[in-house]
A protein has these predicted regions:
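OB-fold and OB-like single-stranded nucleic-acid-recognition modules
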Residues: 2-219
Length: 219
């Protein structure tokens, strides 16, 4: 169990306590529904729907994030396109085997969703284990950056594999870590468009990752 001084909070008024010895995957988003919800899948006898949520950064650019929620949640919130929403949930990953777009897709599984007039917000807190050696590199502008792949356990025993990046001194420190390192990070979920070279030309794709503002090695 982590010491009390490692217990953090995203927003107590939302009941979203960042108690790292109890919750290792929490997301808080405020943004705008960018398109009408579409049917996603059925699991455990429940229908799930998905929609894109646009969240504005301080820079003025936007992250477009995939939200997945139960049909009952969708009916209760009665949200329409362009609605302002608060989403509390968990970051999930799945492998895209359709052969189109990114291979690893991140979604936010909504545990709570409601209409809001709060400003845009994008925060995530994760505790997990490195499952791949860090990839340290330098950007064309000379900034140190390090790519990490974090395995975050669910209560069910399965794991989500979440790509993360960190910068500067944090990137240089993370570059020395090994597979099996346990760490905690806080940051935001971001979407990033890029071009993929294919046989018939360039294809625009979207990558999803966690940009870490704070990161700490736990074990």
């Amino acid at each position: 169990m982590l010491p009390q001084n490692r217990i953090k909070h995203l927003n107590e008024k939302d009941g979203m306590r960042m108690e790292l010895n109890q919750e290792n995957n929490q997301v808080r988003l405020c943004g705008t529904m960018a398109a009408a919800p579409q049917y996603s899948h059925n699991a455990g006898g429940q229908d799930f729907y998905s929609f894109p949520l646009e969240v504005e950064r301080l820079s003025g650019s936007f992250d477009t994030l995939n939200i997945v929620l139960r049909e009952s949640q969708l009916a209760a919130v009665e949200a329409e396109e362009k609605a302002r929403l608060l989403v509390l949930g968990e970051l999930r990953s799945f492998n895209n085997r359709r052969g189109e777009g990114a291979k690893l897709v991140l979604t936010v599984l909504a545990r709570e969703i409601r209409l809001t007039d709060e400003p845009d917000d994008n925060r995530v807190s994760l505790t997990g284990t490195l499952c791949k050696l860090p990839n340290a590199r330098v950007t064309p502008l000379g900034r140190d950056i390090c790519d990490l792949l974090l395995a975050v356990n669910r209560r069910s025993g399965r794991s989500d594999y979440l790509p993360c990046i960190c910068w500067g001194s944090r990137a240089r420190e993370a570059a020395e870590w090994t597979v099996g390192t346990v760490l905690h990070l806080e940051g935001r979920v971001q979407s990033r468009d890029y071009l993929k070279l294919r046989g018939d030309g360039l294809e625009r794709r979207t990558a999803y990752e966690v940009s870490a503002a704070e990161i700490e090695k736990l074990a």
